[in-house]
UniProtKB/Swiss-Prot annotation:
SUPFAM superfamilies: Chaperone J-domain, DnaJ/Hsp40 cysteine-rich domain, HSP40/DnaJ peptide-binding domain. Homodimer. Zn(2+) 2 binds at C165, C168, C191, C194. A zinc finger (CR-type) spans 135-217. This is Chaperone protein DnaJ. Keywords: Chaperone, Cytoplasm, DNA replication, Metal-binding, Repeat, Stress response, Zinc, Zinc-finger. SMART domains: DnaJ. The keyword Transferase does not apply. Its main location: cytoplasm. One of its GO terms (cellular component) is cytoplasm. CXXCXGXG motif repeats lie at residues 148-155, 165-172, 191-198, 205-212. One of its GO terms (molecular function) is heat shock protein binding.
Length: 380
């Protein structure tokens, strides 16, 4: 079954910018994240979205994809290789193998016994706003394929060892001859008995079933840096899967941030809080205390401050994930609507409204109480 187009998966055009691709990825990955979306196909969609983003967010991979699609251009004509044929029957045409190497991908068949690196692992971590802002140390468990401790990766039962495959005699390939009008052609294919390794395991390890690998859940300790952004990827070197006779690969931790604090919003390193004050305090000015995630901070409210005004506290925001400096905190002022007024208070407000003020000239069509209602209208 052919894979869907990566641009179609993310819902962006082929001319989309990296920022548009990143925005679409964040939106879709949150929607289909298995921890949030309980639909049966959510995990598969999430994997599909991640794969599309990994390609389209990388300039080199994206250019390759735009040119060749999802097929590997190095495969030539359906993976046809010169190694599959012995052209020895054409003794008078010594250059034919070179020609086939040129046109059909060339290259020798990969040695199945050659060292192979393990796989990179990915772990998705959900963070609260506080954890993303201040960092977090925690233990995580990841599924991983590791070397079997019973046979030490040989796949053979302890006390025995792999033998030379009796079918291919250790070559890893089986040859069949075919006569044609053009001469003799020898077709080589991977030995189905040993899988191309050239070795035959007569008594397999009962722990790993002869594969030399076992699946385990591995616990590792990770440190999430303060100031990590939503959707940012953290690399943990040397903790991925162990390869065959080579070292470990990496783990990539993908962060998703879910704020439990309804009055907070974060953009990059900017921290935004809402400060609710009574009407008289805004009219006359005051010193207030903002309650951000770092604790109480003193804040000077100028006289005549309007609801919706944003006040900046420099260096009181989220730490920089790279370890230097802090962002700014922005406090948005909101007026607290009085719910119960005495007759005297109502009369004073009417008198205040009749007196007017300089602000009335900027909005001649809004009465005072209309402004108050507008100021306290719930935000959508």
């Amino acid at each position: 079954m052919a894979k869907r187009d990566y641009y179609e998966i993310l819902g962006v055009s082929k001319n989309a910018t990296k920022e548009e691709i990143k925005k679409a990825y964040r939106k879709l990955s949150k929607k289909y994240h298995p921890d949030v979306n309980k639909e049966p196909d959510a995990a598969e969609k999430f994997k599909e979205i991640k794969e599309a983003y990994e390609v389209l967010s990388d300039d080199q991979k994206r250019a390759h994809y735009d040119q060749f699609g999802q097929a590997d251009p190095n495969q030539g004509f359906g993976g046809f290789r010169s190694d599959d044929f012995d052209l020895g029957g054409f003794s008078g045409f010594g250059g034919f193998e070179d020609i086939f190497n040129t046109f059909f991908g060339g290259g020798r068949r990969r040695n199945p016994n050659a060292p192979r690196a393990g796989a990179d692992l990915q772990y998705t971590m959900t963070l609260t706003f506080e954890e993303a802002a201040f960092g977090k140390e925690t233990d995580i468990e990841i599924p991983s394929e590791e070397t079997c401790n019973t046979c030490h990766g040989t796949g053979a039962k302890p006390g025995t060892k792999p033998e030379t495959c009796p079918h291919c005699h250790g070559a890893g390939q089986i040859s069949t001859e075919q006569s044609t009008p053009f001469g003799r052609i020898v077709n080589r294919r991977t030995c189905p008995y040993c899988g191309g390794t050239g070795q035959y395991i007569k008594e397999k390890c009962t722990t790993c079933g002869g594969t030399g690998r076992v699946k385990r859940r591995k616990k590792i300790h990770v440190k999430i840096p303060a100031g990590i952004d939503d959707g940012q990827q953290l690399r943990v070197a040397g903790q991925g899967e162990r390869g065959l006779t080579v070292g470990r690969r990496e783990i990539y931790i993908l962060s998703f941030m879910w704020s439990r604090m309804s009055f907070l919003n974060v953009t990059a390193m900017i921290f935004i809080a809402k400060c609710r004050l009574r009407l008289r305090k805004l009219r006359l000015g005051m010193k207030s205390k903002s309650r951000p995630f770092t604790g109480k901070l003193k804040l000077k409210i100028p006289a005549g401050t309007q609801t919706g005004t944003r006040l900046r506290l420099k260096g009181k925001g989220v730490p920089n994930v790279r370890g230097y400096g802090y962002g700014d905190q922005h406090v948005i002022v909101r007026v607290v609507t009085p719910t119960k007024l005495t007759e005297k208070q109502k009369q004073l407000l009417r008198e205040f409204d009749q007196l007017g003020g300089s602000s009335m000239h900027h909005e001649p069509h809004d009465r005072f109480f209309d402004k108050v209602k507008k100021a306290f209208k719930p935000e959508s």
